[in-house]
């Protein structure tokens, strides 16, 4: 059913018999999105009633005790999915209660028909054994039904401290016994903090995939490579009994790749465990990285990716401050040249100059200028071009002058040394005053 028709049909279904509110396409999209968060694959585009029925059965089998989707949210998701199923199945419910009744009637009828089919098979093949963990769904097709929520939690706890180590590989071998190829990939992608480990595992899987494709050219009777890795197959096709050998092969590939990554991390110093010391020269650190990457079994693209990022992320604080503006994709020559002066006296003097330059900048960002020479970066009292009023030379003030030129003599104040004043007699213009 197309989205436009589905949206019109949803507007005719009320949420409850007592309310006039109707369902919208947003309610269905929300329910599908919540199912995807729980690891259940579903696509609303061109979905069929059988696919929605499988989704409802898988959602009901989940253990939501430790999940935030419980209570009202769980009930709302189930009710919305049942309304969607009833519309895709050709029913026209007026409200959600009628959709629940349609679903119950269909499940009872399917259960009875399934028992009849099982009875016929048992009568024909009385010694037939059921192949678990593949279980039979409501539409009769076998599929895997693992509790991926618990397995995601177990895997997160196993890789929380040390990433993919030997203990995590053992846990991975236990929890992937009942998983399909796509579910194993989802499990690996659930640890973003250990992205380097997962990328190494994926590179080793790609190498095995390439080797199998090469081998397949001379052995056409072997299983298809896409079937082994689960590529291009739906979840129901991956879970069929005919692909049991392919699931086991892919699981073995994943375990072998994870074990190689764990051995590379803990048996010898690998590139992920190499960090630059506080006083270690940057070229020596890069040399260690290159040596470790050369001994690693990975494609050249993966090695180059690790070298570009680890040379920046695992550098010490001083080198990282210089390398971050360049970025991981910068050429190695530029990185070596940028870190050449790190820790030297030239860099320290440069830091001091930048610190003093920041002091001479005003709060509003305007640079101070000297009123004597007009140059920025200092004020008049610190200017080196000011002249001494005593000797006339630049570079110091009169109070700091050490020149003997212009030194004051013992003459009375008001008379400078070097100046000679002649004493002249003054003739009075009037006779002296005589007092009787």
Curated annotation (Swiss-Prot):
Residues 400-436 are annotated as: Disordered. Keywords: Capsid protein, Host-virus interaction, Metal-binding, Repeat, Viral budding, Viral budding via the host ESCRT complexes, Viral matrix protein, Viral nucleoprotein, Viral release from host cell, Virion, Virion maturation, Zinc, Zinc-finger. A zinc finger (CCHC-type) spans 368-385, 386-403. It holds the Pfam family zf-CCHC. The keyword Transit peptide does not apply. A motif (PTAP/PSAP motif) lies at residues 428-431. Residues 408-428 have a biased composition (Polar residues). GO terms for biological process: viral budding via host ESCRT complex; viral translational frameshifting. One of its GO terms (molecular function) is zinc ion binding. GO terms for cellular component: viral nucleocapsid. The record marks 125-126, 344-345 as: Cleavage. Belongs to the bovine lentivirus group gag polyprotein family. Late-budding domains (L domains) are short sequence motifs essential for viral particle budding. They recruit proteins of the host ESCRT machinery (Endosomal Sorting Complex Required for Transport) or ESCRT-associated proteins. Nucleocapsid protein p13 contains one L domain: a PTAP/PSAP motif, which interacts with the UEV domain of TSG101. Matrix protein p16 forms the outer shell of the core of the virus, lining the inner surface of the viral membrane. This is Gag polyprotein. It comes from Jembrana disease virus.
